[in-house]
Amino acid sequence: MRFSYAEAMTDFRYYIPLAQAAEAAGYHGMTIPDSIAYPFESDSKYPYTPDGNREFLDGKAFIETFVLTAALGAVTTKLRFNFFVLKLPIRPPALVAKQVGSLAALIGNRVGFGVGTSPWPEDYELLGVPFAKRGKRIDECIEIIKGLTTGDYFEFHGEFYDIPKTKMTPAPTEPIPVLIGGHADAALRRAARNDGWMHGGGDPQELDRLIARLRQLREEEGRTGPFEIHVISVDGFTVDGVKRLEDKGVTDVIVGFRIPYIMGQDTEPLESKIRNLEMFAENVIAKV
């Protein structure tokens, strides 16, 4: 089992020492959140809070995903950075291909390209992208980014994007794993066609259902190769629980040590955060 450390919506000056501490403690990865901006008004509900409340996001600092990952990659040597998750269809795919390809080449292929659609129509409006057909749009984005990060000439002609024969360098020396976030059936099918899935949390029974559905969809898609399953689960906090997750096919456990979905700023000191991640490494990672 591999373990990824998750921290978000905290003092952005903490990220560098936290990444260094996580690497030293034996974590395999660290998750990198994504948010462009906070809309003053929205009719949408936040998908990962019980009541759909989104106000806790107001004023929370999010360093741009590629900028943060490059900074953390420069001060680590082994830690992998998994986007959790990048709002892909609001961005131009050719530019994202250049960003993620350059990043992976620069930091030694230590990038997990976690992507999803945004639940906020305001994100699309802000960046001048239609909210409609976002599922089809993200599929085209993924195909384009995969093609442009090979280092070979690639062209694409789709419903939303038209890419003439083009080569981008530098390219990573390994394919960048494409990990899909989301619990909807369309997201699960998209994950089944790609390299892995990123779980957004929830009760254990729901996780079992989602994993079973992923297995079914992979069979339908004829996919038999390696597949990453990244989950948030209470089972991830004990040695016995980790074994149960392994038996279900989970490859990566995402662990954090506070609930970020609360109003106000995070006041936990950096020293406390580091001690928490170190204690988990001593009590769980070292014993599995």
Question: Where are the model-predicted features located?
Answer:
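Active-site-adjacent structural elements that line small-molecule/cofactor binding pockets in enzymes
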Residues: 1-288
